[in-house]
A protein has these predicted regions:
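A structural motif corresponding to the C-terminal end of an alpha-helix
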Residues: 2-6, 66, 98, 189-197, ...
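Glycine-rich, histidine-containing beta strand-loop boundary motifs that form or position
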Residues: 9-13, 77, 106-108, 201
Length: 361
């Protein structure tokens, strides 16, 4: 609440972690799921229920009489196979009956493709979950080739929740600049397909340098200091410049998603109705600087955009460089003005650079 965040709890569906133990004996039998389902229902009542309800009263007694306005509930994390489906269905049935306003999140398993992924997506559609949680921890080449991943997703199916993702990069599992750059490139496709991808969250947020369980992570810390990684800045540049409406942006009459004739360029564009400005994100993943022209077309004849816009440039000469506790600000975005003339921006995007352009209407 202090951060303006909203809750999205993930509840146990009666399956053990299938990575750790895929034996049927480790799972809750179907006819013994009732207590797990009731836990999920009680959680919703605790979060949203009136203080006259059993769990709403508990919440009030704990010092929070106002509801938490829970909107989403995920059932299971990185589960797969028929054993997941037969447990998910009774959860969905019970929640739909008692709390039809809650959006239910299912999962497509631990991978971004493959047998389990291909099995689970049709099942998620059949069961009619609201969102499907996709996870992908992948190397650089995967992110470079996945800028158009969501272009052909079914617009009528469940929405996507990209619930965990990160670019590992060259066998490393920390946040060097090139990994962050390719995450920025991938996110242009996420933003362009906002009608399909409802939410996205990066890999774990916080990790202690001497006590971590998983990497990469967005923020590293020791007992005295903390450091924001390159990936953190990418997330910040997207989160603080997300706009209110997606607008089309093309190169050679195609989406700018690193296609064969686009020289490693990726781009997305939004209109921010709150601040009355256009926001264009451009990522140059190539090894060479590239001249570009951003032309704002289809505007009313009375609209003339001339003057100064803003550009926020995120770049490192060394793709393997990173921010660390000793040099926490080695790589940070830099803001400056850029000329807008005749509804156009003519500029050059540096090699391996992520730029956010902001132009007021």
């Amino acid at each position: 609440e202090d951060m303006g965040a909203e809750p999205l709890p993930v509840v146990n569906c009666g399956l053990a972690c299938q990575y750790q133990n895929d034996s049927p004996e480790a799972n809750v039998p179907i006819d013994q799921l009732d207590s797990y389902i009731q836990d999920a229902l009680d959680l919703i009542e605790f979060a949203n229920g009136d203080i006259s309800t059993t769990w709403g009263k508990v919440r009030a007694e704990m010092g929070h009489p106002e509801p938490f306005h829970l909107k989403f509930l995920a059932i299971g994390n990185e589960q797969w196979g028929e054993e997941y489906i037969v447990r998910l269905e009774p959860f969905v049935k019970a929640i739909r009956k008692q709390y039809p306003e809650i959006k239910i999140v299912g999962t497509s398993g631990p991978g971004s493709e493959g047998e389990e992924f291909e099995y689970l997506w049709p099942e998620m559609k059949r069961i009619k979950v609201d969102l499907v949680d996709e996870h992908f921890y992948r190397p650089e080449n995967w992110f470079l080739k996945s800028g158009n991943r969501y272009d052909l997703y079914d617009r009528k199916g469940p929405k996507v929740f990209a619930g965990e993702y990160a670019c590992h990069g060259r066998g490393k599992k920390w946040n060097h600049f090139e990994a962050a750059l390719l995450e920025a490139a991938f996110l242009t496709g996420v933003e362009r397909n906002a009608d399909v991808v409802e939410m996205a969250t990066y890999a774990p947020l916080l990790a202690h340098v001497e006590g971590w369980q998983w990497r990469p992570d967005l923020i590293w810390f020791d007992n005295l200091k903390s450091v924001r990684t390159c990936s953190w800045y990418v997330q910040s540049l997207y989160g603080n410049n997300k706009g209110t409406n997606v607008i089309p942006i093309t190169l050679n009459k195609k989406a700018v998603s690193g296609q064969a004739d686009q020289n490693g360029l990726f781009a997305s564009a939004v209109w921010d109705g709150t601040n009355n400005e256009y926001i264009v994100k451009v990522v140059n993943t190539s090894q060479e600087a590239q001249p570009i022209q951003i032309a704002f077309e289809g505007l009313k004849k009375s609209v003339k955009m001339d003057g100064d816009g803003k550009q926020i440039i995120f770049h490192s000469d060394n793709p393997d460089a990173e921010n660390n506790l000793e040099q926490p600000f080695a790589i940070v975005p830099k803001e400056s003005t850029i000329e807008v003339k005749g509804n156009q921006i003519n500029t050059t995007v540096g090699a391996q650079t992520f730029v956010v352009y902001k132009v007021r209407k």
